[in-house]
Structure formats: structure tokens, C-alpha cells
């Protein structure tokens, strides 16, 4: 039986139900890869009303998406190479994400110290931090220059014998961790109507007349089935070249 519509919004499916939907629905988009890029793609597309399938060969967020620093940052380090346009774009993305998930992404203060042999003075680092703050549209607490004595007073655990001073600035951290964040995005995508399943491997994909025909394998049982979509998104990260092989 061919189903024109995925499950209604807010109705989670059992694994068997998800596999049945994957094989019986003509999707607008099927996303391969359940890391951060795949999860965001599935959520964004399903939130815009498209029929979306999401498959992952292992656990969701089992690859590089669970090996991050848990930071949601605006690219402060790239100011060292004066890449203003890149930092401005990263700050915009950071701000949008923080605004969309205020309980999952939290503003956090950081302190960076400069040793005696540093290539630039603390005042110059403070200037850079203020430029970073400005590129971030002043959305965080303002950065501060910190003298050696102030750092010792505020953070007595920091060894200050060989430092010149430092800066204090804000960026964002995930409230839990990266894999939890990705999993929550996958759940959000399902709430918007996406059909999701992990331990489903793409064996092959063939583009026909305006449609992708996919051969999928349920790794828990070894059984294979077919799925179809107008668009195929390969979001497998560093394994992108291995998908379907």
C-alpha cells in the first residue's frame, strides 16, 4: 500500500512503523546520516512541510557529532587571520541557534590568558574580543580585559607567574552534550512529521526519472527494502564517500 502522507505531527512511530513508512511513502527528501547535519536538515525540511525520511546506519550522533567540544561558537580564533566575513557569518549562525534553543544552548564566560612570550599584548587581545562581541551583534555580556592580578583574584587556581594578563569573553555551550543535542533534534524532526530510523544502511541509490530509488538494509534483522524520494541528501560527514558502498 502506498501512503501519500507520513504520520501526523506529534505521533511517534514504533521502529517497525518507521520502517514500514520508509518503504511505503514517496518522500520529498530522504536524508542519509543521523549526525548534526542530517538531524538539522531533517528538522528544517519537515518543519517547512516536506515529507522527509531520515536514516542512520548506526546510533544517531555516533560519529563526529559526539566528539565535539560542545561549544556553539562564532569563530573567535579566525580573527587571528582577520577573516572578518567568516566570523560574522559564524556569529549570525550561533545567535540564531542560541535564540532557537535557549534552554539547550547557554551563554558561558571564558577566560583566556596570555603568557610572556605571546605574539600580541593583552590589550590587543581585548580589542579583538570587543570586535568579536560587535560581530556577534552585542548579544552577549561584554568582554573584559583582565590584568594578571585580577586573574589571580578571580581564578586563584590559574598559575599566573608567567602570564602578562588576559581576557574574559562569552560564547555558548550545550547544556547537556553534543549527542544529546543531536538526538533531541531528531526527535523534533519526528514531531514535525519526519520518518526516522537508525541502524538502517543505504546499500545503493539510483536516480530514475525524477526520483531516487534506494535500497536500504535493516541492520538489526538483515532484511532489505526499498524507499524512494525526489531528493537525496547525503549527510554522512567524513563517511560521505562510503555511502551506498
Regions found by a protein language model. Name each.
Residues 1-29, 44-48:
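Extreme N-terminal leader/targeting segments of oxidoreductases
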Amino acid at each position: 500500500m502506498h501512503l501519500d502522507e507520513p504520520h501526523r505531527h506529534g505521533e511517534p512511530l514504533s521502529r517497525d512503523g518507521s520502517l514500514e513508512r520508509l518503504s511505503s511513502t514517496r518522500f520529498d527528501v530522504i536524508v542519509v546520516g543521523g549526525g548534526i547535519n542530517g538531524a538539522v536538515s531533517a528538522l528544517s525540511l519537515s518543519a517547512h512541510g516536506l515529507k522527509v525520511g531520515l536514516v542512520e546506519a548506526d546510533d544517531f550522533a555516533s560519529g563526529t557529532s559526539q566528539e565535539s567540544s560542545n561549544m556553539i561558537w562564532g569563530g573567535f580564533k579566525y580573527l587571528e587571520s582577520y577573516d572578518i566575513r567568516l566570523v560574522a557569518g559564524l556569529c549570525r549562525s550561533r545567535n540564531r541557534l542560541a535564540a532557537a534553543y535557549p534552554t539547550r544552548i547557554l551563554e558561558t564566560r571564558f577566560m583566556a590568558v596570555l603568557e610572556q612570550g605571546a605574539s600580541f599584548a593583552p590589550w590587543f587581545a581585548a580589542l579583538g574580543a570587543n570586535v568579536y562581541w560587535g560581530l556577534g551583534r552585542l548579544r552577549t555580556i561584554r568582554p573584559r580585559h583582565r590584568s594578571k592580578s585580577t586573574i589571580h583574584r578571580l581564578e586563584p587556581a590559574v598559575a599566573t607567574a608567567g602570564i602578562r594578563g588576559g581576557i574574559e569573553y562569552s560564547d555558548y555551550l550545550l547544556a547537556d552534550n553534543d549527542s544529546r543535542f543531536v538526538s533531541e533534534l531528531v526527535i523534533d524532526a519526528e514531531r514535525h512529521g519526519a520518518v526516522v530510523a537508525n541502524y538502517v544502511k543505504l546499500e545503493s541509490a539510483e536516480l530514475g526519472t525524477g526520483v531516487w530509488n534506494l535500497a536500504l538494509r535493516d541492520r538489526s534483522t538483515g532484511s532489505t527494502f526499498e524507499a524512494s524520494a525526489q531528493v537525496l541528501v547525503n549527510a554522512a560527514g567524513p563517511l560521505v564517500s562510503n555511502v551506498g558502498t
